[in-house]
Curated annotation (Swiss-Prot):
Any one Pfam family match given in the protein's UniProt record, by short name: A_deaminase
Active site residues of this protein: E200 (proton donor)
Gene3D superfamilies: Metal-dependent hydrolases
Reactions accelerated catalytically: adenosine + H2O + H(+) = inosine + NH4(+); 2'-deoxyadenosine + H2O + H(+) = 2'-deoxyinosine + NH4(+)
Biological function: Catalyzes the hydrolytic deamination of adenosine and 2-deoxyadenosine.
Essential cofactor(s): Zn(2+)
Cofactor: binding details: Binds 1 zinc ion per subunit.
Gene: add
Entry GO CC: cytosol
Gene source species: Erwinia tasmaniensis (strain DSM 17950 / CFBP 7177 / CIP 109463 / NCPPB 4357 / Et1/99)
Signal peptide: none
Source lineage: Bacteria, Pseudomonadati, Pseudomonadota, Gammaproteobacteria, Enterobacterales
GO molecular function, one term: adenosine deaminase activity
Site (Important for catalytic activity) location in chain: H221
TM stretches of this protein: none
Record-given protein name: Adenosine deaminase
Length: 332
């Protein structure tokens, strides 16, 4: 359950994995694109997971239609604004929305830096209209290789003031983190915070690599950490947070059942683990579902859910003053 006395956060939430089906239809018509369906009901199986996908890459393919319709920078601005609206409607007080500007730019050849600027504009407009604090995490999509990731990093750093952190996402097995060392060195030099998708498709060594070589302060998913007791101890001792996404890990077949999910083990071990959505529109869920349905099915007690909710703000990429402001806004 969600504790109404605590700020509700979602710090692992993909902006480009949360494009409304209606928006996909609208933009498809606007740019005269051929979509796989012309009604919401018929489109949904193409853009939303109906049954668990066999692997992570199959799951990621569901995101493609959402970005294929981004035919202009205004379209990018629209989906960013709608993401803030969706988070506010879900009762979230603080969100970190992450996006891959190269992925969003790819289909229609948009300028990557322009996509970054449009997303920042949309987020700022959304925050001005709703009682929510949102920060942006730029993603480098490892699946497209080192050069494409460099272009993404260039675009993100061109608008550094609007970007809080850097992430690496995509095909973890095919494109291991060691290929992106120079990218992360540059990002850290620019003052960006670091989170990395690791231990989702690959094993515990991928998490070690993200921490030791890329400078990860948090780990996205990280389910394979349970395979390495020394890593579990290290995560707890060093305060390296885990951004858990329960339903997502079932839908990608990363974990067989919610009862098998390691989130409870993480919390019992003193790791700063959190509850997040991942790709709400693609998954057909919202943060409330993760607390009210997924977390109990994963064996979490009410107290453990409360701890996970507290951890969300604890490991957020905010200063202590900014965290206090989030708490004060809830109390007001």
């Amino acid at each position: 359950m969600i504790d109404s006395q605590l700020p509700l956060t979602d710090i692992h939430r993909h902006l480009d994995g949360n494009i409304r089906a209606q928006t996909i239809l609208d933009l498809g018509r606007e740019f005269n694109l051929t979509l796989p369906a012309t009604t919401l009901a018929a489109l949904r199986p193409h853009v939303q997971v109906i049954e668990a996908e066999p692997d992570l890459v199959s799951f990621l393919n569901k995101l493609d239609w959402g970005v294929k319709v981004l035919g202009s920078l205004d379209a990018c601005r629209r989906v960013a604004l709608e993401n803030v609206e969706d988070a506010a409607r879900a009762g979230i007080h603080y969100a970190e929305l992450r996006f891959s500007p190269g992925y969003m730019a790819m289909t229609h050849g948009l300028p990557v830096a322009g996509v970054v600027e449009a997303v920042i504009d949309g987020i700022r407009a959304g925050c001005a209209a709703h009682n929510i604090d949102v920060r942006l995490i730029g993603i480098m999509s490892r699946t497209f290789g080192e050069d494409a990731c460099l272009r993404e990093l260039d675009g993100l750093l061109a608008h550094r003031d609007g970007i809080t952190a850097l992430d690496l996402a995509g095909d973890e097995l095919g494109f291991p983190g060691r290929r992106f060392l120079s990218h992360f060195n540059r990002a850290r030099d620019a003052g960006l915070r670091i989170t990395v998708h690791a231990g989702e498709a690959a094993g515990a060594e991928s998490i070690w690599q993200a921490i030791r070589e890329l400078g990860a302060e948090r780990i996205g998913h990280g389910v394979k950490a349970v395979e390495d007791p020394a890593l579990m101890d290290f995560l707890a001792q060093e305060g390296i947070g885990i951004e858990s996404c329960l339903t997502s890990n079932i839908q990608t077949s990363t974990v067989a059942t919610l009862a098998d999910h390691p989130l409870k083990t993480f919390l019992n071990h003193g790791i700063l683990a959190t509850i997040n959505t991942d790709d709400p529109a693609v998954q057909g869920i919202e943060i409330e579902h993760e607390y009210h349905v997924a977390a109990p099915a994963a064996g979490l007690s009410v107290q453990q859910m409360r701890v996970a909710q507290e951890n969300g703000l604890k490991i957020a990429f905010l200063s202590e003053e900014e965290k206090a402001a989030v708490r004060a806004r809830l109390a007001a």
